């Protein structure tokens, strides 16, 4: 029969795994948003404005969704927080550049 200490340790392990999964989700979605931004750049360059606008809208939605997840993330190390802030900035800068094309 597990002790209270065992249950606490298991709870902490599960919580840490969930937090890591959340960070992985944020990183993956930010990369997907960057892909949408690159697709939009290409589409604008080819004159496919509707396709470009759709790609930008998807990237913007992903950006705002991930900001919400990021704001709720707990126990971030300074390094991870800085890494994610840098990725958010890169995406925001890219989206701003792409939107000037449209």
Regions picked out by a protein language model, each given a short descriptive name:
Residues 1-54, 61, 68, 72-102:
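Long, non-catalytic architectural segments outside compact domain cores
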């Amino acid at each position: 029969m597990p002790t209270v200490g065992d249950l606490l340790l298991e709870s902490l392990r599960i919580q840490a795994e969930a937090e890591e999964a959340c960070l992985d989700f944020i990183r993956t979605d930010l990369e997907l948003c960057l892909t949408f931004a690159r697709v939009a750049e290409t589409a604008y360059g080819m004159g496919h404005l509707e396709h470009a606008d759709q790609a930008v809208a998807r990237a913007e939605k992903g950006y705002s969704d991930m900001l919400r997840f990021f704001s709720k993330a707990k126990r971030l190390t300074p390094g991870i927080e800085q890494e994610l802030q840098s990725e958010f900035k890169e995406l925001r800068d890219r989206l701003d550049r792409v939107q000037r094309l449209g």
